[in-house]
Amino acid sequence: MTILFLTMVISYFGCMKAAPMKEANLRAQGSLAYPGVRTHGTLESMNGPKVGSRGLTSSSSLADTFEHVIEELLDEDQKVRPSEENNKDADMYTSRVMLSSQVPLEPPLLFLLEEYKNYLDAANMSMRVRRHSDPARRGELSVCDSISEWVTAADKKTAVDMSGGTVTVLEKVPVSKGQLKQYFYETKCNPMGYTKEGCRGIDKRHWNSQCRTTQSYVRALTMDSKKRIGWRFIRIDTSCVCTLTIKRGR
């Protein structure tokens, strides 16, 4: 009886006790940190609470931890972006650049984190509210169809820098243990989409519309016309926007 009693006590306190949530460590993976470009970290040692036989562990702890990590990363990214006062004409946002030995299989980390944050927000809704908040169920469509993909310097070859000059984008960056390729995450208007003849949802009786690819500046290793190699801000495709002009009366 004594052994049975001790076993029951140990089991009881074992179920009541939950392992503490360890802090998520962010470690840079497979890319070189260089001026203006942040390395992409991974959520590595994320150990959640141990789930007991009675299901005493709450999933909100894990969600709160992920939200905390996401907010820290997004806040850190805001510090990387220059102030609007010093940069009204160019967006220096450089999370679209990655140095890697192979083609990245997923979008940049911050893109995934924003999607996951939206998923966490939706997870807190009731099933009915979640269905009504789904853009597909509300009939929401993008004004312009766009595509995003990773491209290499071999695809770009040349680019325009901030001074308006044409520079050669170097395909490989030398590092201590070899070389890494430069990859750029570009977004542009989809030439095979349904909006190549004009923006979606625009009244053609009163407006002329066109989907256009816009560019932003990112930092990359380049070579100018004088064979000088260095890190420069170059323009890459980053979005597809709708431009409108009013139709004049005849």
Swiss-Prot record:
User: Which terms are listed as keywords in the entry?
Assistant: Cleavage on pair of basic residues, Disulfide bond, Growth factor, Secreted, Signal
Q: Which residues form the propeptide?
A: 19-131
Q: Hey, what's the signal peptide range on this chain? A: 1-18
Paired cysteines (S-S): C144-C211, C189-C240, C199-C242
Q: Name one GO cellular component term.
A: cytoplasm
Entry's localization field:
Secreted
- UniProt-listed GO biological process terms: cell surface receptor protein tyrosine kinase signaling pathway; modulation of chemical synaptic transmission; negative regulation of neuron apoptotic process; nerve development; nerve growth factor signaling pathway; neuron projection morphogenesis
GO molecular function annotations of the record: growth factor activity; nerve growth factor receptor binding
* InterPro entries in the record: Brain-der_neurotrophic_factor (IPR020430), Cystine-knot_cytokine (IPR029034), Nerve_growth_factor-like (IPR020408), Nerve_growth_factor-rel (IPR002072), Nerve_growth_factor_CS (IPR019846)
At what residues does the UniProt record annotate the site feature described as Cleavage?
Answer: T57, S58
PTM note says: Mature BDNF is produced by proteolytic removal of the propeptide, catalyzed by a FURIN family member. In addition, the precursor form is proteolytically cleaved within the propeptide, but this is not an obligatory intermediate for the production of mature BDNF. Can be converted into mature BDNF by plasmin (PLG).
Q: Provide the primary localization.
A: secreted
**Subunit text:** Monomers and homodimers. Binds to NTRK2/TRKB. Can form heterodimers with other neurotrophin family members, such as NTF3 and NTF4 (in vitro), but the physiological relevance of this is not clear. BDNF precursor form: interacts with the heterodimer formed by NGFR and SORCS2. Mature BDNF has much lower affinity for the heterodimer formed by NGFR and SORCS2.
What role does it play?
Important signaling molecule that activates signaling cascades downstream of NTRK2. During development, promotes the survival and differentiation of selected neuronal populations of the peripheral and central nervous systems. Participates in axonal growth, pathfinding and in the modulation of dendritic growth and morphology. Major regulator of synaptic transmission and plasticity at adult synapses in many regions of the CNS.
Entry's family note: Belongs to the NGF-beta family.
UniProt name for this protein: Neurotrophic factor BDNF precursor form
